[in-house]
């Protein structure tokens, strides 16, 4: 078929580098009503999240299984990022990626907010749901907050605590209240025993 005379309308927004982080999320929020976009997606270009992503790609961790091969924790700044990276390259390259970034060590923006707010004593925010909790987490971040290596280590240690708590609670069969029991339990542990907890040790061992 001859499509020479077909005209396709397009709206193109040219954004300068200096304002990209500010404008791109707003464009996504206000112009796209046809695709389901989650609130957390609007923060994808946040400098804070970009820094967490950078750290997750450069920091090696001990293999909790005792193997000599070290691993990394994959922070998924954009949805589907892990699957996209895993599918790249040859089969051997894909296998190497999975060895380096095991699926169990993948976490998203909303996961990060859940672990941090549980530890900080805001389980009631976590209980409101992933998107609402993420909004509150980002709102409470100090302006220009950027994690360093030690902050990333501490966060992974908090993840390890949360995930272990989740497994224990799951075995107790709390049914539909599991999510609430887990976040409130982690908040209680942090509140009562924070001074005695050595996050660096958990990070070094990659387990409690």
Regions found by a protein language model. Give the residues of each.
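Accessory terminal alpha-helical modules
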Residues: 2-208
């Amino acid at each position: 078929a001859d499509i020479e005379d077909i005209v396709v309308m397009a709206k193109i927004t040219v954004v300068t580098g200096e304002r990209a982080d500010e404008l791109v999320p707003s464009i996504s929020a206000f112009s796209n009503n046809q695709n389901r976009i989650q609130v957390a997606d609007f923060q994808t270009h946040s400098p804070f999240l970009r820094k967490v992503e950078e750290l997750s790609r450069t920091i090696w961790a001990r293999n909790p299984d005792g193997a000599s091969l070290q691993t990394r924790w994959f922070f998924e700044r954009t949805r589907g990022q892990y699957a996209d990276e895993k599918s790249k390259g040859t089969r051997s390259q894909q296998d190497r990626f999975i060895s380096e970034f095991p699926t169990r060590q993948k976490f998203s923006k909303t996961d990060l907010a859940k672990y941090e707010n549980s530890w900080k004593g805001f389980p009631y925010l976590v209980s409101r749901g992933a998107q609402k909790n993420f909004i509150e987490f980002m709102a409470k971040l100090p302006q220009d907050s950027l994690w360093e290596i030690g902050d990333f280590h501490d966060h992974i240690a908090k993840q390890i605590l949360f995930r272990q708590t989740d497994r224990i609670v799951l075995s107790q069969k709390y049914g539909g209240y599991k999510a609430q029991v887990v976040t409130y339990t982690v908040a209680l542990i942090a509140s009562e025993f924070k001074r005695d907890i050595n996050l660096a040790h958990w990070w070094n061992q990659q387990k409690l």
